[in-house]
């Protein structure tokens, strides 16, 4: 696994995590 794919994987994890936090925050949980 090279550094580019690792960086993309990390970026997707952070993006998905922050997006789910926003959704949960708006739904009142």
Curated annotation (Swiss-Prot):
It comes from the Eukaryota. It is a single-pass membrane protein. Keywords: Chloroplast, Electron transport, Membrane, Photosynthesis, Plastid, Thylakoid, Transmembrane, Transmembrane helix, Transport. The keyword Chloroplast applies. GO terms for biological process: cytochrome complex assembly; photosynthesis. Signal peptide: none annotated. It is found in: Plastid, Chloroplast thylakoid membrane. The keyword Transport applies. The chain crosses the membrane at residues 3-23. One of its GO terms (cellular component) is cytochrome b6f complex. GO terms for molecular function: electron transporter, transferring electrons within cytochrome b6/f complex of photosystem II activity. SUPFAM superfamilies: PetN subunit of the cytochrome b6f complex. Belongs to the PetN family. The 4 large subunits of the cytochrome b6-f complex are cytochrome b6, subunit IV (17 kDa polypeptide, PetD), cytochrome f and the Rieske protein, while the 4 small subunits are PetG, PetL, PetM and PetN. The complex functions as a dimer. Component of the cytochrome b6-f complex, which mediates electron transfer between photosystem II (PSII) and photosystem I (PSI), cyclic electron flow around PSI, and state transitions. This is Cytochrome b6-f complex subunit 8. The gene is petN.
């Amino acid at each position: 696994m090279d550094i580019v794919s690792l960086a993309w994987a990390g970026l997707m994890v952070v993006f998905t995590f922050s997006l789910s936090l926003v959704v949960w925050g708006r739904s009142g949980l």
